[in-house]
Structure formats: structure tokens, C-alpha cells
């Protein structure tokens, strides 16, 4: 896996954003059970500090979620790695992400060589994410919309990744999943959630597996500018 040249150039940091600090994060993720070396290498390369407010840059490589405004967060690196590892098991080519947020998860997926489609309901967050994609030379297709409806024009997808929690899995998204594809999403209430993995098998049937307890912001309907 080779990152785009502009991403490699931007990835260089100093102090608490240095490569040494990122290496420590990757080792922590490995110790916490992340095994896919493609995912670990990508997390090592993609500059998380560029996806958060400059005031929080010193905390960019802590294994913790951080606020990005509008009541949203950039997910904990372990959660990003776990969800990415789960979808990579089906060797996807095209993936739909629901909830662009800062754009960090999108950048991880694109840097793994996937064709990424991402939807964000908050216009300001999407504009900021698009600016980061351009700065890093990452090609990602994005739109401002209600993510719960998916993106039917480009369906089916080999993988769908949802970055906000709904009370149940959304049928509209499941319908856009290709045969052999996988959907990974947090499911539950604000007080109790689990990361769920859904796979559409070769005969078209659906299997479910609960992966981990997690905490995500809620998946909300509608759009904001």
C-alpha cells in the first residue's frame, strides 16, 4: 500500500505529531487486538492531526475520540481501525461511508485503495473535509445529504460503514449492499451500543455478528448547512 505523494509529504509532523508518536499509537492498536497490517500501516501514514482543530493537535495521536464541532467527534483510532479491519476482510473495492465527519475515516479507506463514497448531513463539516481531501491529494466522492437513505446511484457497494448509531440497522442501506458485501455499524441507544457486522452471503441471505461494545453519536435525520 502506497499513499499518494502529497499525503506522504503532509504526513510529516513534529513533536506530538511526529512519526515516533504515531508509531506508539500503532503499537497500542496492535496490543489491543488490531491485526491487519494494511490497516495499521495506513493509520501510521494518514496525518490525523490535520483532521482536527489545531488547538487539539497535541492530542491527535492519543487513542481517544476528539470533538470536531456541531456535536460530532472524530472517532477513537482503535474504533476506526476495528471498523476498517472488519470491512477489509471481504476485500472490498467500493465502499459507502455514512457520516463523513472530519474526513479521517474516509481518508483511511481511500488510502487503502478503496473507491470511497461518503455522505455527510452537516454542510460545514463536509466542506472542511473536502478541503482536507484536496490538500492531501485524496480522491473521494462525497455529497451533502441525509445518510440514512444511502447513495442509490452508485449501489451496490462491497462494503458500507456507518459512523453514527441508529436504534436498528437501516433496511435502505442493507438493500444497497452487494452479494458478498459487509456492513459495519454501531447499533443501539445513547446509553448502550454495540458494533454490529452484517454480511450478505453468496446465496443472498444475511448474517449478523456483534463485534464490540462502543459509544457513537446518534445518527440523525435531515440536513444542516
UniProtKB/Swiss-Prot annotation:
Pfam families, per database record? PCMT
GO CC annotation terms, alphabetical: cytoplasm
Task: State its Enzyme Commission number(s).
Answer: 2.1.1.77
The protein's UniProt keywords, in alphabetical order, are: Cytoplasm, Methyltransferase, S-adenosyl-L-methionine, Transferase
Q: Which GO terms describe its molecular function?
A: protein-L-isoaspartate (D-aspartate) O-methyltransferase activity
Q: Does the keyword DNA repair apply?
A: no
Q: What does UniProt give as the signal peptide span?
A: none
Q: Where is it localised?
A: Cytoplasm
Q: Which residues catalyse the reaction? A: 75
Reaction(s) the record says it catalyses: [protein]-L-isoaspartate + S-adenosyl-L-methionine = [protein]-L-isoaspartate alpha-methyl ester + S-adenosyl-L-homocysteine
Tell me the enzyme class.
Answer: transferase
Q: Which Gene3D superfamilies match?
A: Vaccinia Virus protein VP39
| Predominant location category | cytoplasm
Is Metal-binding given among the entry's keywords?
no
Q: Name one GO biological process term.
A: methylation
- Family to which the UniProt record says this protein belongs: Belongs to the methyltransferase superfamily. L-isoaspartyl/D-aspartyl protein methyltransferase family.
HAMAP family xrefs: PIMT
Q: What does this protein do?
A: Catalyzes the methyl esterification of L-isoaspartyl residues in peptides and proteins that result from spontaneous decomposition of normal L-aspartyl and L-asparaginyl residues. It plays a role in the repair and/or degradation of damaged proteins.
**What is the protein's given name?**
Protein-L-isoaspartate O-methyltransferase
Give the organism, scientific name. Xylella fastidiosa (strain Temecula1 / ATCC 700964)
